[in-house]
Amino acid sequence: MKVIFLKDVPGQGKKNEIKEVSDGYARNYLLPNQLVKIATNNSVKTLKEHLKADQEEKELAKAQTKQIKKTLEELTLHFKLQTNDDKVFGSISSQDIVNQLKDLHRIELDKKKFIRFKNINKIGINYIKVKLDFGIEAIIKVDVKEV
C-alpha cells in the first residue's frame, strides 16, 4: 500500500515522504495512529502543492533575513558612557542594543542571537556578531562615546 507519512516514523519514513508499506502494517498500526494517510492521486497532488508553497515561504523568509543582515551591517548604533580619568562607568548590554534597534530602526532581534557577547565598556568603535536565521551572520557596528 502506498502511503504519505504525516509524522516521522523511525525505520519507516519521514514526514511528507511517499512510500510503499505492507497493507497489514498500514491498516493495523500506521493508519489508526494517524501516522500516515493513503496516497491517492489527489493527496499526492495536494502534498506536492503544499511542499512547493513551503519552499516558497522559506525562500521568502531567507530573502528577508538577508535584507535584515544588509540593514544591520549598514547602520551604526551610538551610545554614550560616562568616564572619569580614563575609567569607564557602566556598560552597554545586549538588551540596550536590542532596545535601540527596536526603537530607532524597527528591527526585532532576540538578545540570545548575539555570538560570544560581553557587555561593552570600551570607548570607540565595537563590533558585535549576531546569528540570524538560516545560519546567516551579521556584524553590528556600535560607536561608544564619552559623555
Curated annotation (Swiss-Prot):
Biological source species: Mycoplasma capricolum subsp. capricolum (strain California kid / ATCC 27343 / NCTC 10154)
Protein known as: Large ribosomal subunit protein bL9
Pfam families in UniProt: Ribosomal_L9_C, Ribosomal_L9_N
InterPro entries hit by this protein: Ribosomal_bL9, Ribosomal_bL9/RNase_H1_N, Ribosomal_bL9_bac/chp, Ribosomal_bL9_C, Ribosomal_bL9_C_sf, Ribosomal_bL9_N, Ribosomal_bL9_N_sf
Molecular function per GO: rRNA binding; structural constituent of ribosome
Gene that specifies this protein: rplI
Keywords: Ribonucleoprotein, Ribosomal protein, RNA-binding, rRNA-binding
Function statement: Binds to the 23S rRNA.
GO cellular component, one term: ribonucleoprotein complex
Protein family per UniProt: Belongs to the bacterial ribosomal protein bL9 family.
Domain of life where this protein originates: Bacteria
GO biological process: translation
Annotated SUPFAM superfamilies: L9 N-domain-like, Ribosomal protein L9 C-domain
